[in-house]
Amino acid sequence: MQYLGVEFNMKHTPKLDPGFIPFGVWRAAYLKEAKQPVAIAVERDKGRVSVHHTCIHGTPAMAEADYRYMERYVKFLLWSTGGFRVSICGCSEIAQRLQKAYTPEGERHFDFTFVNQLFERDLEILDLPLEECPESNEVAQPIGGYMDGCRIGFDAGGSDMKVSAVVDGET
C-alpha cells in the first residue's frame, strides 16, 4: 500500500474499514528514509520538559508525509504526556502549519480547547531552530500505592480473564 508517498505493507486489511492505515506500520516505513533531524519538546507543569528526537524527509516531495508524521506525533505526545507548550525544532514549515492547526478554528481545535481547559492556559506551538531545542527536564515521581478504600481490577486477557478485589489493602 501507499500513503503520502510512503510504501508500506499490511498483513491484514480490515473488512469493515479497508482504508484504515495503522500509524505504527506507516511510521516504520516512513522513518526508513527519513534523515533530517528534528525534535519535539513538550513543556508541562513545574518546568518539566519531554524532548523527543526524530527525523523527517525534509524534501518538497515528502512535505505532506512529513507534516502528517509530525502532526500525529505531536497529538500523541499531548495526549500521552500532556503539556501546554510544544516546541517544533528544526523545521519551520511544519511548525507554522501546526501553529495554524492548533487554534480554535484549526484542524486540531478539539485538542487545542481540551489542552487549554486542562492546563488553564493557551496551548503554544513554538518554531525553534534545532540547536535551540529546550533541554529535557524529567522528574520521576511515584504513583499509586494507595491502600485505603475499595479497589477492583479486571484483566480481559487473550485466553483467560482475571478479577481481583481489595478492601483497605486486603484481598
Residues covered by each model-derived region:
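Nucleotide/phosphate-binding catalytic cleft detector across ATP-hydrolyzing
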Residues: M1-R151
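Gly/Thr-rich phosphate-binding beta-strand-loop-beta motif of the actin/hexokinase/Hsp70
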Residues: V139-G169
